[in-house]
Amino acid sequence: MSSGQTSISSLRKASEQDLPAVLQLHRAAFPAEEVEQIIQVVNELWSDTTDATHSALHWVITAHQTTIVGHLSLSSITTQDNQMVGWILAPLAVVPTHQGQGLGSELVDHAIRHAMRSHQPRILVYGDPAFYGRFGFDRQQAVNVKPPFPLTQPLGWQGISAKGKELQHPIELRCHAALMHAQLW
């Protein structure tokens, strides 16, 4: 292991006590002009009171047993009549000092495994096609899902589904209230 790499001790489900460290992680990982918006999203996703219909799951990666260096949220997505049809991956962050070491990939792989074992094995993401494409996300898997707002970067709207579980009919997406802000899309 090179001196720039860190011993990763665990990938685990996040707890309430992790929220302050996760917020600090996002402050370090995102550009200044995006930080407050991302912090609001994380806080709302973490709160059980902001959305009774859509649940959110959080995972963190720690280094040296205690320092949180990565975070990913996966929240449920539904149709207009509140039928769950899968998950949306947002946000994902790794502290800059630990980027390039595969931690983001480890979190995404874990989220995919979780979703594929669930009763709705599908994940949507609005992000970098080059990064998410490495995991099997593609635009075709998201073509039947209308996002809640017009996309500023349409190529970033991608999905991944278990074989045979692709959406056959168009749906209009509903997601956690934390993600229902036009400026995020």
List each language-model region with its residue ranges.
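C-terminal "cap" of GNAT-fold acetyltransferases
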Residues: 147-185
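Conserved active-site alpha-helix within GNAT-family acetyltransferase domains
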Residues: 117-121, 126-152
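Conserved acetyl-CoA-binding loop-helix of GNAT-fold acetyltransferases
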Residues: 89, 94, 100-113, 125
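Active-site rim helix/loop that mediates acceptor-substrate recognition in acyltransferases
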Residues: 19, 23-64, 69-73
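Short loop segments at secondary-structure junctions
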Residues: 64-66, 97, 161-166
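A short beta-loop-alpha structural element at the N-terminal edge
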Residues: 9-22
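Conserved glycine-rich acetyl-CoA-binding loop
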Residues: 67, 81, 95-106, 118, ...
